[in-house]
Structures are given as C-alpha cells and as structure tokens.
C-alpha cells in the first residue's frame, strides 16, 4: 500500500477501475464495493473490477487500432478538422475513451459511433477551441437525444440521419478550426535545471494539489539535455522511457504516446515536462513526465 494517494493515483488508477463496471456491465458492482462493510467482500469485488479493467483496456486498444486506421483514411479524403470513427460492434461504454484519445492525439474534436439497429449511439470529445454542445445544439432536431458540455457530449441518432449530421458538424468544424494548429498550446511556467527539483521543492509542488482543470501541474523547460538511453515501452510501444542527463545528473523520464519519435532522441533535446515523486520498494525518486520535446539548437 502506498504511503500517499495522489490525484494521479485517483485519476489513472482507482477511478478507471470504479468506472469500468458501468462501461462493460453494470455500475451496481462498483456501488457494492463502495458500500461493502467487510474487508473480504471489498477485496473480492476489487479484484474482479481490476480484472474487468484489464479486459476493458484490451477491448479499447483493439478498437483504437481500427479507429486510427479510419482517421488516416478520412484525412486522405480531406476530413481534417473533426474526427469521425465508428464500428457496429464497439461497446457503447468505450466510445468516450476512443473519442477522447483520438482528440488528444490529433487535437481535434472527435466523435465515435456504434450500433447495429436503427438507432446509433455516439460519444464526442472536444478541444478548447470548439464548443461541442453548442455545435450539437445548432442541429439539435436531428438527434433522438443529446446532452453534455463544451468538452464532452453524447447522443443517439437514427442511422438515416447520420450522414446529414456528419456533413453539418464537419462544416462547423471547418469554419471554426481552419487556422487552429494540430496541437494544444503548451504553457511553460519556468525554465529550470532539474537539480532544482529536490525534497523541498517537490513538497512545495505537492502542496499545490489537487491538480486538474483550472489548476494544471506546473510545466518546466530544460535545454541541452543529453539522452543516455531511450526505448519504446507499453503494449504496443506507444510510449518512450528515457534516461537523461543534465549538468552531470541523471534522471528517469517517460514520454507518453510519443513512441513514434524515438529517432529524435539521438540528439540533444529541449524538453518540456512535469515532475513527480515515484515510489518503488520504499524508495522515492523524481520522475519527469515529458509533455513535448524538440532537438536542441
């Protein structure tokens, strides 16, 4: 058991396991865990949810392979400002995960659809420059049901109306996002040397939690970073694990969803990153999470 539970532990460890039952089965299982009054029952349900979450991860990964292929095909057809993906047998509970990851990777609003009958279900995820619920409201009569907010929404729609909706929302996206680059603006808080990150400063950064919407983690930049080693990690080699050095100090770093950029790490780099304590076998070390990097010039 970890000594401290962080917001990151909640966001990426605990909450997905609580959500998974509603995605694949029924939310009642997670409710039973929260209401459980005995340790044995809690452990039993928690193990089941952890197993179900691994199943969800595999289902989502397989669906994403197909979704990414569809994005490439659609972009070749000129559909650049909104991402449409879908397959009849995708489980409704993973549609938001598919749309969210594609939106994050391409920095464009994304809509994922599934269903075999007359009525289809869809989830939408967006970016700050595109108000999704406002866009859906502009053609609200076309849906059976819809709802959400600026960054995320969902709807049901008749199959016969899907093409018309796709044309309308694509037109809105082209109007709105024509000059928006395919990547979010990364706000840098300070240029530092990583050796500034010690017990005292990390404790100060921890005191600023919880991080999240409206209070993002501080992002630092360091120039002239030497890459000691770099390798792809993750089930599909999607991520980069690096050992880097700066001013003769060595640091561990991870760059999520940037495995395809491994060739760039053969050069000295300028990196933008966040920092956190990583606990392993009772020992704490500082790990850098690289948000972006470029070759140092």
Language-model-derived ranges and their functions:
Residues 41-45, 51-85, 138-297:
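Mid-to-C-terminal polyanion-binding domains and interfaces
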């Amino acid at each position: 058991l970890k000594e401290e539970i962080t917001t990151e532990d909640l966001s990426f460890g605990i909450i997905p396991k609580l959500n998974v039952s509603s995605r694949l089965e029924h939310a009642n299982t997670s409710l039973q865990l929260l209401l459980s009054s005995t340790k044995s029952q809690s452990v039993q349900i928690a193990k089941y949810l952890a197993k179900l979450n691994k199943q969800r991860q595999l289902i989502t990964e397989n669906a994403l392979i197909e979704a990414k292929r569809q994005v490439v095909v659609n972009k070749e057809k000129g559909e650049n400002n909104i991402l449409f993906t879908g397959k009849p047998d995708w489980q409704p509970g993973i549609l938001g995960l598919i749309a969210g990851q594609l939106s994050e990777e391409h920095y464009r609003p994304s809509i994922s659809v599934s269903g075999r009958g007359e009525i289809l279900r869809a989830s939408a995820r967006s970016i700050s420059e595109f108000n999704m619920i406002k866009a859906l409201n502009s053609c609200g009569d076309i849906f059976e049901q819809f709802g959400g907010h600026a960054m995320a929404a969902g709807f049901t729609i008749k199959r016969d109306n899907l093409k018309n909706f796709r044309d309308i929302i694509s037109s809105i996206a082209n109007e709105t996002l024509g000059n928006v680059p395919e990547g979010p603006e990364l706000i840098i808080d300070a240029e530092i040397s990583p050796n500034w990150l010690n017990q005292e400063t990390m404790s100060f950064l921890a005191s600023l939690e919880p991080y999240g919407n409206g209070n993002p983690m501080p992002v630092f930049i360091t120039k002239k970073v030497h890459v000691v080693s770099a390798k792809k990690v993750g089930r599909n080699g999607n991520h980069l694990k690096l050992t880097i050095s700066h001013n003769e100090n060595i640091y561990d770093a991870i760059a999520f969803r940037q495995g395809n950029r491994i060739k760039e790490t053969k050069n000295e780099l300028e990196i933008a990153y966040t920092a956190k304590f990583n606990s392993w076998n009772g020992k704490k070390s500082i790990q850098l999470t690289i948000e972006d990097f470029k070759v140092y010039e």
